[in-house]
Amino acid sequence: MSLGRLCRLLKPALLCGALAAPGLAGTMCASRDDWRCAGSMHEFSAKDIDGHMVNLDKYRGFVCIVTNVASQUGKTEVNYTQLVDLHARYAECGLRILAFPCNQFGKQEPGSNEEIKEFAAGYNVKFDMFSKICVNGDDAHPLWKWMKIQPKGKGILGNAIKWNFTKFLIDKNGCVVKRYGPMEEPQVIEKDLPHYF
């Protein structure tokens, strides 16, 4: 039996650690390429804005907002401002924000990682910035492929990310608990946070 088939059979039992010991799902489905097999966000890794590989297991026990960002979008100002505010108010409660620059929508994130980091510093960003990625298509980062197929990560009219600043709320176990469209400002997430802290 292939590892992929085994993981698909066991996934209902392992999903988000429902019946598994912590880390077991990651042991079973450790291949970064077999993203469908993952049971939580914590099984992935991504390069930060400085190019260092980050194991997302570091977010175990934290509530996370994962979003794609762009510097030249009409929604940039409101999203960066509100994300910075949410992080400032709730970081001590266990909120973490993971921002992934993406140039797939109107080519509104054309800069280098260094330029994006400098832009974000203008908003006094203290949350975690990652290297530029794709969120749709064959070249999409495995984390984003995985989030889009989760029961509470699916979109309206298909699972593809529609635009900049699509946001996913992730619980302490690394499970997607809600997806917010690009027109929903970060402040709407605030009402959902207390349920997961």
Swiss-Prot record:
Entry function: Essential antioxidant peroxidase that directly reduces phospholipid hydroperoxide even if they are incorporated in membranes and lipoproteins. Can also reduce fatty acid hydroperoxide, cholesterol hydroperoxide and thymine hydroperoxide. Plays a key role in protecting cells from oxidative damage by preventing membrane lipid peroxidation. Required to prevent cells from ferroptosis, a non-apoptotic cell death resulting from an iron-dependent accumulation of lipid reactive oxygen species.
EC primary class: oxidoreductase
Annotated InterPro entries: Glutathione_peroxidase, GPX_AS, GPX_CS, Thioredoxin-like_sf
One Gene Ontology cellular component annotation held by this UniProt entry: mitochondrion
Assembly: Monomer. Has a tendency to form higher mass oligomers. Interacts with FUNDC1; this interaction promotes GPX4 recruitment into mitochondria through TOM/TIM complex where it is degraded by mitophagy.
Matches recorded under PROSITE patterns: GLUTATHIONE_PEROXID_1 (PS00460), GLUTATHIONE_PEROXID_2 (PS00763), GLUTATHIONE_PEROXID_3 (PS51355)
Catalytic activity annotation: a hydroperoxy polyunsaturated fatty acid + 2 glutathione = a hydroxy polyunsaturated fatty acid + glutathione disulfide + H2O; (12S)-hydroperoxy-(5Z,8Z,10E,14Z)-eicosatetraenoate + 2 glutathione = (12S)-hydroxy-(5Z,8Z,10E,14Z)-eicosatetraenoate + glutathione disulfide + H2O; (13S)-hydroperoxy-(9Z,11E)-octadecadienoate + 2 glutathione = (13S)-hydroxy-(9Z,11E)-octadecadienoate + glutathione disulfide + H2O
The protein, known as: Phospholipid hydroperoxide glutathione peroxidase
The UniProt record lists the keyword Transit peptide: yes
Keyword Mitochondrion among record annotations: yes
Pfam families: GSHPx
Modified residues (Phosphoserine): S40
Cited PANTHER family: GLUTATHIONE PEROXIDASE (PTHR11592), PHOSPHOLIPID HYDROPEROXIDE GLUTATHIONE PEROXIDASE (PTHR11592:SF134)
Family: Belongs to the glutathione peroxidase family.
